[in-house]
């Protein structure tokens, strides 16, 4: 639900699901796509997001009998591969699920990561997701808490300073450029 929206909107959608006792897999799985869409309306693109959430629920039910813990307990490589085969889950979402739900070391690359690293001259502007992810995975120790903190700090710096119109003079990374 976090794609293309502010976190405050996602929080409203989650609160709505919680108020309706729908933060449980069985309840969410039983809910129709249209009912789910109405409940997550505040997160934007709610019809597409409902379709994607329902696709995930259907996959989890069909392949794992609804056992999220068992699904998430797979090794990193096979779990990432399976996640990427589910409708609506791309690399960033797969890596977010691995890092924050399965607690497995998989570095999340997002718009802020690309923007910060490009503006500082550390990577090419046209670097692809997998190439930048591989760079982090090769250079950093595979530690879940470290990856979570690193990602959170990049998101914070991106949100506060490295926007489309940047605030470079105030950025804590100011001066840390290639060359």
Regions found by a protein language model. Name each.
Residues 2-179:
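Catalytic cores of DNA base-excision repair glycosylases
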